[in-house]
Amino acid sequence: MKVLWFSHLVPYPETGLGVLQRSYHLVRELARVHQVYLLAFVQRKVIGELLGDVDAGLERARQHLDQYCARVQFLSIPSERSRLGRTWLAARSLAGTYPYTIRWLLSEEARSTATEWNASVDFDVVHFDTLSLAPYREIFTRGAKSLDHHNIESDMMLRRARIESHPLKRLYFWQEGLRLRRYERHACPLFDLNITCSSLDTERLKAVAPGVTAAEVPNGVDTEYFRPGGGPEHPLSLVFAGNLSWYPNAAAMLFFAESVWPMLKRELAGVTMDVIGANPPSRLVDLATRDRDFRVRGFVPDVRPFIGRAALYVCPIRDGGGTKLKILDALAMGKAIVAHPIACEGIGVQDGHDVIFAREPREFVQRIVTLLGSPQRKDELGRNARSLAESVYAYDVIGRTLVRELEQCRARHVANRDDFTRGER
């Protein structure tokens, strides 16, 4: 098959966190079997954080992705051309047809390029890697259309509104969430296939848009790259890794720093915490300047040494949809994990078997203290975690699932098209 992978980001490098990691590995696995064409928007801030110089980083990305893809082209994002571009776009979205999440990637350059690609290549499947790209569906007149939901955007936005304390922000998030819900209800049934990361997100999507055809392609992890080892553990050390530009990550670390850490320090002398991730909030940085045991590392090119040395991985995320790839990374590295249940949504973990759940600050403290005082129990959790990652979430396994779903999507599309053609005769 000829598959167009239309992406809201450049899926490189493979060591990137979150959705970037998922997209890279799925493109690579799909390209083992089918011909992949990549059309990707450039999020310059992401490229800069991961690769330093943006232009040089894009050239590296192009050269690498050319190994897998029949054609690669990058697109600019209009709102990134000025310092206040996104702020102005958010303000305009309040009165416009589309919510901000959908307006973000609207571009004449993208429409022109998509039109040219549609005319020059007979795609069997056009895969849209996020809801924000759904307005471009109408351009592609041939082939099946699939839409990937890394999160159910309306659900995530409405959840964010419920926990936001600032009244104006809460109102904005609530309005955005309701408008996204209306958009999802209209747009998602137009696709031949909607791909979610978990059965829970499929339920959420079908609650919004009951007529959709949906299938789960879980997030995965590179179990060769993320594996146990890397040196001895520090017995009282904790770690969290995740891009702190994403509000659920930042909110999780602020919750931990302000509500859990003070109690934990009182009960466990010598405990340390490493927070890994670009763009840490100033409140976290301020705490790190006052407390040498709470270390905010910012962006690091390789998270594995920090995760490997930690005795426990802590993930107090209480918001956000999809599945959290940071949990999968920690599972693959054989780490004992203490996490809020929401952080593990969509992942087949069992509380007490391959992860320990905690919800409130006191629970986090109790679970952490107990595990750090029981090395055998901690190691057992880590072994179970690694086993789960290898058997269910390795990317070669996930890749086969994606290939099967896209092939079936195309077959249904062809069958429906042929039925329609016969009916017109």
Question: What are these regions, as identified by a protein language model?
Answer:
Residues 377-392, 398-401:
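A short, well-ordered alpha-helix in the C-terminal region of glycosyltransferases
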Residues 75-135, 139-140, 168-190:
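Conserved nucleotide-sugar donor-binding subdomain of glycosyltransferases
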